[in-house]
Amino acid sequence: MPSMRVTTDTWPRRAAQEPLLLLLLRSSLMKSASLQALNPNRAMAAMGRSVRVVLDSSVLLDPSGVTAEEEEVVVALRPGAEALLRRLRYSNLRVAICHPEGLPTNESGFLEKTAKLYSFGYMPLTSPSGSNLLNELMLEWSGTNFCFYVTSGVHEGLLSELQNHNWEVIAMGNEDVIKNSGVIHISMLQELLITLATSIKKEIGNSSAFVVGYVMKQSREEDFAKRGAFPIYPSKNDLIFVPLSFELPLASQLQEVDLVLHKITDEIINIDPNSSISFPKGISFSPGMSEIIRFVEEHCDFCVIDPFKNIYPLLDRIQIQEILIRLEGLSAEGRPKLRAPCFLKIESFCGSELQKQLAEAKLSFPLIVKPQVACGVADAHNMALIFKIEEFSNLSVPLPAILQEYIDHGSKIFKFYAIGDKIFHAIKNSMPNASHLKSSSGGKPLTFNSLKTLPVATKEQLLQNEVQDSKLLDINLVEEAAKLLKELLGLTIFGFDVVVQESSGDHVIVDLNYLPSFKEVPDNVAMPAFWDAIKQSYESRKQMTQT
């Protein structure tokens, strides 16, 4: 990583051009259709000013380069830049990439393609006419925008011009080189997002603004981010989201954020199934997650959404069953029966012993076999549908396991999401009735992964079972169940699946999970509910710790 330098006699071409940055930036952003798509009116709603981030090429390009056999330098992003750009793309910040005039064609072309890929503005710094307007334009920008210029090399003239017009300069490199300059220093590119987040919060000066640090696997983060869930620019209710990086000291990051939103199960390395009834004993977490857990234990007033102890029961399908059984009191005369599926825990697939257990539990075929561990490990979603006792032989589902009755439900599943105080639901196609599955099984157990290869009813099967969905479901009953589950679980955001048994009309809750994706809920409805749920939960928990 190059050191940061202050100089008046090096980089002469760049020194002459860099003060023109704002004029060029304005021109480029006005022409950028991709940035117009970010909807400035939406962005202005939270604090009345857009936030613009200009990334100099020096912080993006790998300074080492890679020399190929032909002695040509291979242009590449420096480590950490790809993740940074991916997150900035959905941050609701106005982002542009700039570089000095005279940059080699392969480098400028690479930067232009990169800007296009991430929907950023792009500008080579060339000499415009009418440079006497420069100061007026700089003043105009600083009056209507909160602006950051990010670089790994700072020219004194540019630094002075930017600071005179209220630009924040973030410099990556050696802090000792520039002293008393007002420059914000970072050592690594991975520090930039949390630096932006805390600077924006400071600029807002609003006690209702909170920085939310979040932890989850990359694929889940990207899914949420693409839907606008994690803006660094404040949400409508003043939440600023920033990912916590395991590449940086976590203690300092946790001191900068107000709360942590997490999907703790994404950070599970291993679970001892023999300890599942006494979670968290027997769970091995990633080093980063383990450090967060220790920090929270040592700082009892620190807010996490949601408390780890409230989530552990959802890792065990036996404990989930026991929670769902407590909902059966909601059933009343004149209403459908609300219940959990009938089940049995087993330690072995031994035929003779199993036959006896099934008789005692009053379970009959077909049965779904599920691992007792509900999530956090690779095989937690490997399941099987069994039609007769002989099919347990050589079954690959991990033990211990639970056997659940298979419920004919007309190939419809109702997915419910509790997001704070709001409850949403969606209807999805599901597995066919047992008779269809048995005829296609070829006399073998039907094995599947419930996240990837779940057998779904065909169009013909759906037509055979066609019933108006509104007549199938007692929404009021299930919403009452959602409210009771919220009390029992102590969770801010959770989901559960309901099927309606064709023969009886029973409403059976077949799955329960923490922080689902709720993809089926329209983003314009789901995201405000998501932000409100987080803020309300934080404020409620803070009140509890202060009383």
From Swiss-Prot:
Annotated tissue distribution: Highly expressed in embryos and at lower levels in roots, leaves, flowers and anthers.
GO MF terms, alphabetically ordered:
ATP binding; inositol-1,3,4-trisphosphate 5-kinase activity; inositol-1,3,4-trisphosphate 6-kinase activity; inositol-3,4,5,6-tetrakisphosphate 1-kinase activity; magnesium ion binding
Give the protein's function.
Kinase that can phosphorylate various inositol polyphosphate such as Ins(3,4,5,6)P4 or Ins(1,3,4)P3 and participates in phytic acid biosynthesis in developing seeds. Phytic acid is the primary storage form of phosphorus in cereal grains and other plant seeds.
Annotated organism of origin: Oryza sativa subsp. japonica (Rice)
Protein's recorded name: Inositol-tetrakisphosphate 1-kinase 6
The record's section on SUPFAM superfamilies has:
Glutathione synthetase ATP-binding domain-like
User: Could you tell me the superkingdom of the organism this chain comes from?
Assistant: Eukaryota
Q: Which reaction does it catalyse?
A: 1D-myo-inositol 3,4,5,6-tetrakisphosphate + ATP = 1D-myo-inositol 1,3,4,5,6-pentakisphosphate + ADP + H(+); 1D-myo-inositol 1,3,4-trisphosphate + ATP = 1D-myo-inositol 1,3,4,5-tetrakisphosphate + ADP + H(+); 1D-myo-inositol 1,3,4-trisphosphate + ATP = 1D-myo-inositol 1,3,4,6-tetrakisphosphate + ADP + H(+)
**Positions that bind Mg(2+) 2:** 511, 513
- Which Pfam families does the record cross-reference, listed alphabetically? Ins134_P3_kin
Q: Which residues bind Mg(2+) 1?
A: 497, 511
Q: Which residues form the ATP-grasp domain?
A: 327-539
Cofactors needed by this protein, per the record, are:
Mg(2+)
According to its UniProt record, the EC number is 2.7.1.134, 2.7.1.159
Q: Specify the inducers.
A: By drought stress.
Keywords (A to Z) from UniProt: ATP-binding, Kinase, Magnesium, Metal-binding, Nucleotide-binding, Transferase
Q: Which family does it belong to?
A: Belongs to the ITPK1 family.
Which residues are 1D-myo-inositol 1,3,4-trisphosphate-binding?
A: 263, 381, 415, 513, 517
Query: What's an example Gene Ontology biological process for this entry?
Result: inositol trisphosphate metabolic process
Q: How is the cofactor bound?
A: Binds 2 magnesium ions per subunit.
Q: For binding ATP, which residues are annotated in this chain's numbering? A: 317, 370, 404-415, 430, 450
- InterPro entries assigned to the protein according to its UniProt record, in alphabetical order: Inositol_tetrakis-P_1-kinase, InsP(3)kin_ATP-grasp
- Describe its assembly: Monomer.
